């Protein structure tokens, strides 16, 4: 990673557009750092630790209300976070690594601010913007995609898609592979950052819109299914608080079994006995087209994500 940080110095991470997702990511990183530096810490690094880690943090927002929200959310952590209002260029100038977390339609304006290209020169820019490919971000800054930005001393853009579970360090983050490939140092740093807030996979850039739909929108999809199950249980006499706890733990347990290697179809079959209540419920779900509807929701969200990055307005209101 080309960086303005001096050899052996600490890295500074700045979050531009530090809203809900930015706060969640910072929360996960800061919680991890607190664990690492705690007395008698039992924390162990299972992945290769980069030679330089972010230890200083900047959060950039537009309003006093946003600044107050960040202060409140990050106050439990020992590592301080510097908050800058309405001065993205200064935040980027002071940083070595920049996380771009604004709304997709705001990216062009932010990256086009006077002095921004110079402030980002030689630095790493991690974009978590839905539907905005790295080529588009390069276009905002340079008018084209550089052949090899790291060797040319330009800003190096990497696209990543975490989700809202970052705040409890259970995110599923997808990192887009780059061409030419990232240096080992840069790749290690990006993986380390997102490993602090959950699991990480790397996939080709062409899959990022689908990854946005599955991992970024997925928590909302699963929450809707969870809510429906809770309502059904309440309708049959269970207290809502207990029904919510039971349903959430059941979903968590099913996910844990799949993550341990169990195929979803086999898991379903293991629970299903001839003439039993499970197959009866499954038949209702199949008759209602739940399988196809959920799959279509992921497909639709993929298309919408691709259009949002292009600045298309009202996408959801024009599709059938």
From Swiss-Prot:
InterPro entries: 6-PGluconate_DH-like_C_sf, NAD(P)-bd_dom_sf, P5C_Rdtase_cat_N, P5CR-like_CS, P5CR_dimer, Pyrroline-COOH_reductase. It is an enzyme of class 1 (oxidoreductase). Keywords: Amino-acid biosynthesis, NADP, Oxidoreductase, Proline biosynthesis. The keyword Membrane does not apply. Its EC number is 1.5.1.2. Signal peptide: none annotated. Coiled coil: none annotated. GO terms for molecular function: pyrroline-5-carboxylate reductase activity. One of its GO terms (biological process) is L-proline biosynthetic process. The keyword Oxidoreductase applies. Pathway: Amino-acid biosynthesis; L-proline biosynthesis; L-proline from L-glutamate 5-semialdehyde: step 1/1. Belongs to the pyrroline-5-carboxylate reductase family. This is Pyrroline-5-carboxylate reductase. The gene is P5CR.
